[in-house]
């Protein structure tokens, strides 16, 4: 059965979508069966996977509200090697529509139940807020991967995110845990990055991934060509870092569960 991970942070611009696309492609490159779900109405993970959000007949929105089935909404990322449930601006209406539905916070979990055995990993790109869409992602997930820049404001907001994850685990999804924290856009020449990284190691210990994602121009360029960095420039530092992250993620599945800590 697939491991389901939400890629989440309530702060924008920390590398959630970049991580979702490139981790999905890296896992697929190691022969894992991967599904990426774009739950952000901006649809950046959809476009970055090579699927035009403006040309969709059905999207994850239609799936959530029961207007299509999984097969109708599913796409394939040619460059990424993974399946995709795409998003477009229709998803902005989900906040209002889902509130009027029964079991509104479990719509995604229920939709995925029939296909979890078809995949090894399901990755969910969340919007940068604790919205009904993010709530659906967290209720459907086994764990949360938290990408974050090593800056003080990001560290400050992390405590709120951890608290929210714990509340959701207590009330709606007892299986939910923090899978790992990922340092993104990292520049070891900056003392601030190094200082915050040291604080993360102190507070979160083994929950912090050893892999660090560097600032890398190829990671920034690849989405405009509708492909992950691994397809755009497989020897780039960014592509190699996400391959390393995929390997670390797979190895972690064999370890005992980790207990969430607060900052």
From Swiss-Prot:
One Pfam family matching this protein: AAA_31
Family matches, as InterPro entries: AAA_dom (IPR025669), DNA_Partitioning_ATPase (IPR050678), P-loop_NTPase (IPR027417)
Highest taxon listed in the record's lineage: Bacteria
Family that this chain belongs to: To B.subtilis soj.
Protein name: Uncharacterized protein PP_0002
Lineage: Bacteria, Pseudomonadati, Pseudomonadota, Gammaproteobacteria, Pseudomonadales
